[in-house]
Amino acid sequence: MAIKRNQGSNPKPEKKERLTKAETHQEQDNLEESIRPHSFDEYIGQKDLKDVLSIVIEAAKTRNEPMDHLLLYGPPGLGKTTISLILASAMGVNCKITAAPALERPRDITGLLVSLKPGDILFIDEIHRLNRLTEELLYPAMEDYRLEITIGKGQAARTRSIPLPKFTLVGATTKVGSLTSPLRDRFGLIQRLKFYEPEELALIIKRTAKLLNTSITEQGAAEIGRRSRGTPRIANRLLRRVRDYIQVKKFDSITQELAAEALDIYQVDPQGLDWTDRLILDTMITQFNGGPVGLEAVAAATGEDAKTIEEVYEPYLLQIGYLNRTPRGRVVTTVAYQHLGKTGEEQLSIFSEQ
């Protein structure tokens, strides 16, 4: 299989590295490539999704035809790209990887489509961000395996139809509701990736540690797993930070105590909240009495981008019950108050009931 990429709580603490974001693109890519599982046997977690895709793969191979187009949705860092590569490996085809922001002009997507071989997989990340012209070019490509190109303008314009080999489009999105109905309806399979359980993350961490030649105890892996926000990408990143810590401190293995010490330094607490999570919650509590408050108001008060708050931080805060969305806005929950050591639960409960 060939892989091709198209380039295109308390008082506010001192700000530390944000572990929900990449340190450098190259560093992250190198790490992910070195530890990426190559089959569903190696892929930990997402059992229901793996069962479905295993059936789809076997059926497609039996009929000697490509898989149906697949839409994967869920929070970032859960393994959408990895799944597309595993699918390509299982089908014995190439996988071309791109992202919607890189497909600005019609020729960007047409160049990719005409370069596909029979059965190839085209993976488009952030597919909800496709512009209208690019999206409309995909309609006949997905449905009829042809590319409709308009040549000329005005009355002299004419349409040329170019046949395409049968291929599989795998789209990935964090905002499935932002896809247009015509695009969403052309996917034969729509599957959601869920946050991982701490036990699953501990298994991922142990596997990664072995590949990185780093010794780690069961308890050490569990400690990192608990603080990884249900996300393998973050688990692997935290593991690397803890590995740095034990190497500098001259320890031989990652234990629970050392993992906790290291992650406390990076201000990743036992619930997986980092500096920005606590800033968001603290701002909502101190400036907006816990809510309800709109997303734009939170963004303005914290200095964070509204889209980043909504797509990167909110999903986990909602998942663990620290934040609620109401028709009037976001509301901090009682358990979040308790975790941050704040008071004001009675006032919070009044807002929650409205």
UniProtKB/Swiss-Prot annotation:
Residues 1-10 have a biased composition (Polar residues). It catalyses: ATP + H2O = ADP + phosphate + H(+). The RuvA-RuvB-RuvC complex processes Holliday junction (HJ) DNA during genetic recombination and DNA repair, while the RuvA-RuvB complex plays an important role in the rescue of blocked DNA replication forks via replication fork reversal (RFR). RuvA specifically binds to HJ cruciform DNA, conferring on it an open structure. The RuvB hexamer acts as an ATP-dependent pump, pulling dsDNA into and through the RuvAB complex. RuvB forms 2 homohexamers on either side of HJ DNA bound by 1 or 2 RuvA tetramers; 4 subunits per hexamer contact DNA at a time. Residues 1-36 are annotated as: Disordered. DNA binds at R325, R330. Belongs to the RuvB family. Residues 12-36 have a biased composition (Basic and acidic residues). Residues 270-354 are annotated as: Head domain (RuvB-H). Residues 13-196 are annotated as: Large ATPase domain (RuvB-L). This is Holliday junction branch migration complex subunit RuvB. Keywords: ATP-binding, Cytoplasm, DNA damage, DNA recombination, DNA repair, DNA-binding, Hydrolase, Nucleotide-binding. Homohexamer. Forms an RuvA(8)-RuvB(12)-Holliday junction (HJ) complex. HJ DNA is sandwiched between 2 RuvA tetramers; dsDNA enters through RuvA and exits via RuvB. An RuvB hexamer assembles on each DNA strand where it exits the tetramer. Each RuvB hexamer is contacted by two RuvA subunits (via domain III) on 2 adjacent RuvB subunits; this complex drives branch migration. In the full resolvosome a probable DNA-RuvA(4)-RuvB(12)-RuvC(2) complex forms which resolves the HJ. Has 3 domains, the large (RuvB-L) and small ATPase (RuvB-S) domains and the C-terminal head (RuvB-H) domain. The head domain binds DNA, while the ATPase domains jointly bind ATP, ADP or are empty depending on the state of the subunit in the translocation cycle. During a single DNA translocation step the structure of each domain remains the same, but their relative positions change. It comes from Crocosphaera subtropica (strain ATCC 51142 / BH68) (Cyanothece sp. (strain ATCC 51142)). GO terms for biological process: DNA recombination; DNA repair. ATP binds at I35, R36, G77, K80, T81, T82, E143, D144, Y145, R186, Y196, R233. Its EC number is 3.6.4.-. InterPro entries: AAA+_ATPase, AAA_lid_4, DNA_helicase_Holl-junc_RuvB, P-loop_NTPase, RuvB-like_N, RuvB_C, WH-like_DNA-bd_sf, WH_DNA-bd_sf.
